Amino acid sequence: MDWILSLLLATVRLAIPVLLISLAELYGQRAGMVNIGLEGLASIGALVGFLVCYVTGSNWLGLLCGALAGILVNMIYAFSTVTLCADHTVYGMAVNIFAPALASFIYRVYFGTGSDLKQITTMASIAIPGLKDIPVIGPLLFDQSPMVYLTFVLVIVTAVFFGKTRAGLSYKSVGEHPQAAATLGINVIGVKYLACVICGALAGIGGAYLTTCYSSTCTDGIVAGRGFIALAAVIFGRWNAGGILLACLFFGFCDALQIRLQVSGIAIPYQFFQMIPYVATVVVLSLIGTRQAGPKANGKPYRREQR
């Protein structure tokens, strides 16, 4: 029972960064912005969040600066794709190449190339009195980091925004038919830039969560493909906040399972266990990816004269 509870606790904690990055992509794609540069945005967010927390001792300030770093880097993608109408895939990949390398360079410039691993104090959990004593559910949902609670609240806010509000419908219209949205007076360019700001912020926070709330260290490759898994989660969740939550919990479970199997003493090379989340991603995309269709204007450049 303790093993199962430990696995479920790890599932929730490991699902959070993927969930934050997935919500970043959801806000982007709902405005027609297919950003495959999530891995890079999360990497720079992880590094900046760690550095700021290391210097100031504030996890919250680290998360905030991680968000700002994600926004700043994503503006390269935004200017290229929205203003210059460049290809989304090319510039997304450029961010994936540039940002992790920049993060690694900054870390080495600041800390040097020594072998000692720098550490910070991760954000403490907050237990909700009464609720935390509920068997199984209590420790899972009511004795967690504040970022876990805030992320679940963000899922609810996102679901309500896109499903129940006029502003959300206007936002989604930019991703479905930007020319029609423009005729209704919607500032399509403004919405797309707003989407890039939100996407950069959430992806940066997702990366900063890994260093300030989960790991306490910052190493090369700490994001470990979660940006690409987040892309799969958006498709798996059918561009719906609730569906994305379930998808991220599934991927979080796969990640938690491979960690537990590595220390279980099974006589199998640990690399096989490390493959589990990525194999699960490929299998999921193979089974359902071809049957899903996102917003109709996803990845398509918008030009005002095309009205």
Stretches with model-predicted labels:
Residues 8-11, 40, 60-68, 90, ...:
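Hydrophobic alpha-helical transmembrane segments
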Residues 100-164, 265-273, 299-307:
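Transmembrane helix-bundle core of multi-pass membrane transporters
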Residues 140-218, 241, 246:
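Helix-loop-helix "hairpin" substructures at the membrane interface of multi-pass membrane proteins
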Residues 176-190, 261-307:
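Cytosolic-side transmembrane-helix boundaries in multi-pass membrane proteins
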